[in-house]
Amino acid sequence: MIQGGGLDTDLIEKPSRDPIINEADNGRSNAIGTIAMARTSDPNSASSQFFINVADNDFLNHPDKTQHGWGYAVFADVVEGMEVVNHIKSVATGSERYHRDVPSELIEITEIHISNAYDQY
């Protein structure tokens, strides 16, 4: 997976809004090309970090409403530009300060497009 949001390009935490309620029981699965909310071990802690699934990650799906069963809420799909996602996936990573898997080159999302295509689910 590729995780983003929450940190600026200097790996400093950005201000975020209050956490949201986990909606992983929405019927969506963490399949390749989906985008989901990242969170801590608290099921209702997602705020500004997200991840793009670069593989089918069924183990992240919602099996039940227990502490370990909540899963991760899928809220969007990559509908165009999966080749960009695959390029990001191929970038070498390392550790920087207390962060792991930091890309060796700056990767920054500068533009996204939101559509109502999600209404079909």
Residue ranges and their predicted role:
Residues 1-121:
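Cyclophilin-like peptidyl-prolyl cis-trans isomerases
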